[in-house]
Regions:
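Phosphate-coordination/substrate-recognition cap region in phosphate-metabolizing enzymes
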Residues: 1-57
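Short beta-strand scaffold positions
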Residues: 6-7, 80, 101-102
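Amphipathic, non-transmembrane alpha-helical scaffold segments
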Residues: 9, 50, 75, 79-83, ...
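Alpha-helix capping/helix-boundary segments
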Residues: 11, 106-107
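Active-site signature of alpha/beta-hydrolase-fold catalytic machinery across serine-
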Residues: 18, 109-113
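Acidic, low-complexity terminal tails and accessory targeting/binding regions
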Residues: 36-48, 91, 96, 112-180
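Short glycine/proline- and acidic residue-enriched helix-loop micro-motifs
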Residues: 56-77, 170-176
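Generic beta-sheet signal
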Residues: 89, 96-104
Length: 180
């Protein structure tokens, strides 16, 4: 490991510290790795979103590439921000092994790009478990080539955030219930 970057937000930073435990490298804070700014969605329980923000919640569920919470960041912006951020990190560290700690939606946006897909295919990209590892190699032209995605084999089953949740699975039977 040659370099560690992290979103300055607490959970990603704690992950970066765990990654860096034995390397002892400086962790470089990178605001471009931050999670989507959820605007009015921030702090609202998922179960309340359909009732409070029906149109925006429907976009999140059905056409996530068009999503933008009131006062928040658009999915398109996150997609472009993550591309620019990771590209800058890779170009600043040619030939080096880099760890970058980020957040679910931001990671999902970057993986969509790294897979060579347009943002409109983001719903086809898996949600990654907390602390899951995705390995992406970059060629001499700094183009990403995913090797593997969402490897959480280091986690015992009880520590997996997704083992006990179903909201991330596709299909109406797994959707969060609307609050009446």
């Amino acid at each position: 490991l040659d370099a560690v970057y992290s979103s300055p937000l607490k959970r990603a930073w704690a992950t970066a510290e765990a990654i860096n435990r034995f390397a002892g490298l400086p962790i470089t804070p990178e605001r471009g790795l931050m999670e989507i700014d959820g605007g009015a969605f921030e702090g609202v329980p998922f179960a309340e979103l359909p009732a409070r923000y029906p149109e925006e919640n429907a976009r999140w569920d059905n056409t996530p590439w068009l999503f933008k919470a009131p006062g928040g960041e658009s999915m398109r912006h996150v997609f472009e921000r993550m591309q620019m951020t990771v590209d800058a990190i890779v170009r600043a560290n040619p030939g080096r092994v880099i760890a970058a700690a980020s957040h679910g939606c931001a990671i999902r946006n970057y993986l969509c790009y790294a897979l060579g897909w347009p943002l409109e295919r983001i719903a086809d990209v898996c949600w990654c478990d907390n602390t899951a590892v995705s390995l992406i190699e970059f060629d001499d032209g700094f183009r990403p080539h995913p090797v593997y995605l969402n490897d959480a084999s280091h986690l015992p089953e009880h520590a997996s955030t997704f083992a006990t949740q179903s909201w991330w699975r596709q299909g109406a039977e797994h959707a969060a219930p609307a609050v009446k």
